[in-house]
Amino acid sequence: MQLKDGGTGMSRRRKHADSPARRSTPHRAAAKNCRPAAEPWLRESRAACSSQLRRAGTRSARRAQRQAAADGGRSPRGKETPVQIVKMDLLSCTFSSPNDPDGQTDIFWDQNSPMTKQLGKGRKKQISSAYSDEISHIVNRIAPQDEKPVTNSMLGVWIGETAIPCTPGVAKEKSRVKASCTKLKTKNREKELMKLAQQFDKNMEELDVIQEQDGKNHDFIQMTSKMGHLDNHKDSVQKPSGDVVPEITCTPVKKQMKGDSRISLAKAQDSSQKPFDQNVEAAFNAIFDGSTQMCSGQLSQDLLDAFLNNSKTSLRKKNALLQEEIITTETLLTENLLNKTPISLSPQIDTTVILNSCVTPCPKTPAAPDTQLDELTANDFEDDWESLLGSEPFLMENAEMLEFVPSTTAQDTCQKAICTSVGENDTITSRTNMNLGGRLRDSKVTLDLPSKTRNGELRNAGEHRFSSHPGDESRKVPFTGNKVSFEKSVTSIVSKDEDYVAVSNLEKVKEDSRNKCILNKHSSNKSSSYTRYPSKQSSELGVNLPLQVPTTDPFDSVFLGKENIVCSTNQSHGSKLNSSFDDWNDPLLASEMVEACHRLEATWDAGEVDDDLFCQACDDIERLTQQENKGSEESESVSYTSTRGSRSSSTASKQASQSAPSKHWNVVSSAVPLSLANKSQMSKPVTVQKRGRCGDGPNILDATNLSVCSKNSSDNKRGPVQVNSSKFVLGGSSNLNVNLGLMSTKIATNMKLSTQQLSHNSLADTAQNDNKILKLPKFTFKKKNPQLNQNHLVGSVPVGKISEDLGKRETVNSLLEANQQQSSINYSESLKPSSPDEEERNRKYSPEEIQRKRQEALVRRKAKALHTVQSAPISLP
C-alpha cells in the first residue's frame, strides 16, 4: 500500500517536475486547494490577502518537501497536510480575531452602517478613520458641542430659540449629520423671522379689534345721549289723565334713574355746557369695564361743578315728576284693587291678599298692580330697606305659633310678612316678599293712617272683609261700623313704636242665663266640627285682640300677639284644661299620639340621629309635663273662686268693651307663662265683643301658650290661673259657637314671627275644611322631612305643627269642659269603631312601648360608643 501510494506520489512529482512552470507549481497547487474555501471572501478582499497567500504557499511547499524526504516515499498522505493547514490559515485570515475591528464591524453593524461600505477598499487607515468619526458623532449626540447663536434683540427673549419657556414646547429636532456653523445660523434666522412675522400678524388683528371696539363705544355714547334727551321729554309729557291709569311701575323707573343718573343725565345737557371729547370718552370706556362706568363717566374729563349740579337738579325734577304721577294714580289703583274679585283662592294665597305686589320706599305709594315687581324690586328693596322701615309704616301680621322655649334673639330670617295699609275709607291689603333677616332696629309697626296725630281713631276698619268661599260672588261682607280708639304705647326699649291694632267687628255675643249646653261632637270623612249649642239659641265667639310687645328683646324686634277670649259658662272649666291634656290615659290624646307616631313610622330608622331625636323628645315630654303639673296644681286653688265675683267681672268686661271708643286702656302686665323663660311682656287689651261669624274670617287663630286669667271685681287685676303649652288651630272657615255665661275665661294666644313656617301660612280649601276645629297634640314627634308637610298645606294650618293627617279620621278634643256641679254635658259621638289595626297601633305606641324603645335607643348608643372606643387604634409613644 505504501509503495503503491509512494509510487503514485513519485509519479505525481515527476509529472509536476516535467511541467514547464516549475516554480509556480506550489503556489498554484496551494491556491487551487484553498480556492473552494476562500473563494467568496477572496472576491471581496483579494488585495488584502494576496501577500499572506504567497507566504503561506511557500511555507507549505517547504514542509511538504521535508516530510517527503523523511518518509522516503512511504507516506502518500503527507502532501495533503499542508492543504488543511493552508485552509485554516486562509480561514483565520478571512475570519479575523475578536480583537480585529473588521470582525466587529461585520458582526455588530447593520447593512446601512457606513463601515460596511468601506471594507472592500483594502486600506485599514480609512476603516479606523471612519470608526473614529462615528465615535465622535455619538459623543456629540450625547453632549452637543455646537453652541447656539446669541441673539441680542429683546424679541428673541420671548420668541427666539433661547426664549423663556412659558408653555411646554415640543422637543427640538436633533440633526444626525453634523452641520456647519453657517448652516445652523441660517436655520435659526429663518425660524426667528417666521415667528416675528406671526407676532406681527397677531398685533395687526388685535389692532383691528381695538379699532372696531372704539367705533362701537362711539356709537354707544351717541345712543346714550339720545336716550337721555328722550327720558327728559318722556317724564314731562307722560302725565296721567283723570281716567287713564298709566301702566307703569315705580320701581323699574326708579332703578333706571338710579343707574343712569350720572351718565345719561350728564350727557343729555345742552351744548352751552362744557363739551368733552368723544374720542377721549371712548378711550375711557374701553379702559374701564361696565362696573366702573358710573365713576369713570363723571370723573373722566374734569366736568364743571355747575355741570354736575345741573345733573342733580334734573334728577330731583325727575323724582318730583315721578312722585306726582304715583300720587295721582293712588286712588285709581285702590278702586281697581277693590273691584277685582278673586274667583277661587289657592291654598298658598291668603284671603286678605288680592294681588302680589311690593311696597316701595316712596311715601304714600300704594301697592302696584304689576305681579312682576317681586323679581324686579328685590335688589332695590334690599338696598333701601332701612329707610323703608324708618319712613314707611307697615303692619306685620303673622299666624305662627310659639315654640316651647322661644329664644330671646330675633328669629326672623327669610320670612314673609304681610304689609297692610289702611286708609280712612278703604282698605288696601297687599302681600310682600320681604327679607327681614338681620336687623329690625328702629322699626315701626304701625298703620299708615292719613292723620298725623299719635292718638287717632280708626274708622270702618272692618268694613270690608273677603269671603273665604270660592263660589261666593259677593266679595264684601258688611259689618256694622264702630269706632275703636287706639293709643300710642312706648315701651322701655322699643322707644319709637306706634302700635295700632285693626280690630275686625265681630258680632255681639248674646247672653244666656242658663248654664246648660250640649257638646255635639261628630266626625265625618274629611271634616269634623266642634259646636257648642246653648239651650235656646246658638251664639258666637267673641275675640279679644290686644297687641303684645316684649320689652326684653335685645334686638328691638317687635312681636305681634293675639289674645282670644273664649267665653265659657264657668270659671272652673279652665282648671280642667291641664288635666285633660296631661293625662296619658285619655283615649283622645292617646289616639293623637298614635297618629303622630304612625306617620313617622315610615321614616324612622335605628340610626344615631333618630335615637338622639327620640331621647330628646322624651326628655322634653317629662320636663314639660312636670312644669304643667305644677301649674295645674297652682291653678286649682285659684279657679274655685266666688262665682259672684266672676259674674261681676264679666259684666264689667262687657261694659268696658261697649265704651271702648271713649276710653284709653291702661297698660297692664299680663301673665307670664313658665315656658316663656321669664320674658316679660306688655299687653294692651282692646276688648271688642260683636256679633260675627268666625267662619268667614280669613285669620287662623293659633294658640300655643294658654294663659287662663280670672278677673276679680274687687281689685280689677288679672291673676294667672294656669299655664298650658298645648297647641290649638282654629280653622279659617270653622264656626265656634259659645254661649256667654256669667264669667269669661281669657286664653291668651301669644304669637310671634317664626323663622321657618311663616311662609306656609295659608287658608285651606273650604270644601274640605268647613265647620272644622282641629285639636293639636301637646307634643309633636317630628323630623324635618318635607314629605310630612305635604299633607298639611291643604289643611289651612302652618306646616310642621299638625300631627294629624287631614285625609284620615281627625280626632276632636273638647276645648272647655263644663262643671258637673253647674252644668250638664252630654257627649254624642258618632266615631268609627276601633279596628284591629288601631288596637295594634295603640299597643305599639303606648307609653310603655315608647319607654322600651327609648331604653333600646340608649343601649344602641352605648354599644356604638363602646365599639368606637375599642376599634380606635392605640398609639404607643
UniProtKB/Swiss-Prot annotation:
Function: Replication stress response protein that accumulates at DNA damage sites and promotes replication fork progression and integrity. Recruited to stalled replication forks via interaction with the RPA complex and directly stimulates ATR kinase activity independently of TOPBP1. Probably only regulates a subset of ATR targets.
Pfam families: ETAA1 (PF15350)
UniProt region (Disordered), positions on chain: 1-82, 450-479, 626-664, 818-877
Species in which this protein is naturally found: Mus musculus
One GO cellular component term: nuclear replication fork
Ranges spanned by the short sequence motif ATR-activation domain (AAD), renumbered to the chain: 107-113
Compositionally biased intervals (Basic residues): 56-65
Domain remarks: The RBM1 (RPA1-binding, also named RPA70N-binding) motif mediates interaction with RPA1. The RBM2 (RPA2-binding, also named RPA32C-binding) motif mediates interaction with RPA2.
Residues recorded with modification Phosphoserine: 467
Biased composition (Polar residues): 818-833, 868-877
InterPro entries with a match to the protein in the record: ETAA1 (IPR029406)
Motif RBM1 motif per UniProt: ranges: 607-622
GO terms classed as biological process: DNA damage response; DNA repair; mitotic G2/M transition checkpoint; positive regulation of protein serine/threonine kinase activity; regulation of DNA damage checkpoint; replication fork processing
Subcellular location: Nucleus
Quaternary structure and partners: Interacts (via RBM1 motif) with RPA1. Interacts (via RBM2 motif) with RPA2. Interacts (via the ATR-activation domain motif) with ATR.
Stretches assigned to coiled coil: 185-213, 306-335
Annotated motif RBM2 motif, positions: 843-865
Protein name: Ewing's tumor-associated antigen 1 homolog
Keywords: Coiled coil, DNA damage, DNA repair, Isopeptide bond, Nucleus, Phosphoprotein, Ubl conjugation
Composition skew (Basic and acidic residues), residue ranges: 454-476, 840-859
Compositionally biased spans, kind Low complexity: 637-662
Molecular function terms, GO-annotated: protein serine/threonine kinase activator activity
Predominant location: nucleus
Post-translational modification summary for this protein: Phosphorylated by ATR.
